[in-house]
């Protein structure tokens, strides 16, 4: 998926020496300018990865409840991966994540998906917030910091 421009007047990321600081990433498809809310909003690769975690069951009565948090988690973490790789790094270079949730009950799904991108523990802060831009459909926002080898 294309990186797209930030939704407001800010930088998506800033590299200073070997440090890469990323603004909070949310699950908005930049091409469609739409919040990711279902598995069908993700590429097939993502759906396949999520199936390995027990998501994307094909059962509407299950997927309708699990999809928003799992899909947004994958989208956000994959976007962070894309930003890091564009700067010549890898996800293993990400050492700190600050994760914002509209409802902490979404954390378990996010944590399972995070394991696909960060198999080793990282420095982590988790915060529950009341709202996020651009709409109430946004459930998860993650900012990341990476140390990139020259």
Features from the language model and the residues they span:
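Short, polar/acidic, helix-capping and beta-turn segments at strand->helix junctions
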Residues: 1-150
